Amino acid sequence: MKTETGSNNNNTTVVNMDFDMYPSISGKQQDPVREVVMKYIDYFLPDASGTSAVAIDNKIEQAMDLVKSHLMIAVREEVEVLKERISELMDKINKLELENSILKSNIPQETLQQLQLQLQLAAPPATPAIQAAPAVQSVVAPAAAGQAVQQQAAGAVAVTGVATSPASAVVPTSIPNGSAENGSSAVESAAVSVEQQVQQVTSAAAAAASVVTANGPMS
């Protein structure tokens, strides 16, 4: 591999590349990577030739300038492509916004509300709202339990008052099922209880009178 032909981008001169051009520097074997770099420099920049350190540095600087220029060209091309793409997207957005405004102005209000409702239903539910619901239920549950306990206590007091009231033994507070037969039976039982109480009072009065007669009047 002694020579190879190639063409420079700046001119059409055919260059012979000597791969064994820099076998060593100051009696030491050259780095393989540096050798490859130097070969590419000789291929693309044939004007900067020589074996001195200054010539090598010049070639490296020229190679770096060449790389920078290629990178700048590539970046500019990419920027132009991105600008075109952004411009196309902006035009599309403007067109869609115009179509949306036209549709909103011509669509019935009911249909628009239905669409908004469908969008709300299709949207994922909010996680904080779901997490807050059990807390509300836990607050409502003790309140409901407290109300139930209060109602039970009030019912117990009412039942106790009915059981201890003398009038409750005479007159019933309610008539089951609202029928005439049940009403008459309740009245009859109340009358019987009244008669029994009258008899008890009469017998007690007679007993007291007999005691007074037997013992005589008190002086």
Swiss-Prot record:
Q: Where is this region: Leucine-zipper?
A: 82-103
**UniProt subcellular location:** Cytoplasm; Nucleus
- Nuclease as a keyword? no
Mind telling me which PROSITE patterns this protein's record contains? Answer: TSC22
Q: Which residues cross the membrane?
A: none
InterPro entries the UniProt entry points to? TSC22/Bun, TSC22/BUN_CS
| Annotated organism of origin | Drosophila melanogaster (Fruit fly)
Q: What does this protein do?
A: Probable transcription factor required for peripheral nervous system morphogenesis, eye development and oogenesis. May be required for the transmission of the dpp signal and for a morphogenetic movement of the medulla in the brain that reorients the second optic lobe relative to the first. Plays a role in determining proper dorsal cell fates leading to the formation of the dorsal appendages.
Instruction: Name one cellular component (GO) term.
Output: nucleus
Protein name as it appears in the record: Protein bunched, class 1/class 3/D/E isoforms
Q: Name one GO biological process term.
A: chorion-containing eggshell formation
Q: Which family does it belong to?
A: Belongs to the TSC-22/Dip/Bun family.
Q: Name one Pfam family in it.
A: TSC22
Q: Decide whether keyword Coiled coil is in the record.
A: no
Q: What PANTHER family does the annotation carry? A: TSC22 DOMAIN FAMILY PROTEIN 1
What domain of life does the native source organism fall in?
Answer: Eukaryota
Query: According to the entry, what is the taxonomic lineage of the organism?
Result: Eukaryota, Metazoa, Ecdysozoa, Arthropoda, Hexapoda
> Which keywords label this protein?
Cytoplasm, Developmental protein, Differentiation, Nucleus, Oogenesis, Transcription, Transcription regulation
State the tissue distribution. Anterior dorsal follicle cells at stages 10-12 of oogenesis.
The record's gene field reads bun
Spell out the molecular function terms from Gene Ontology.
protein homodimerization activity
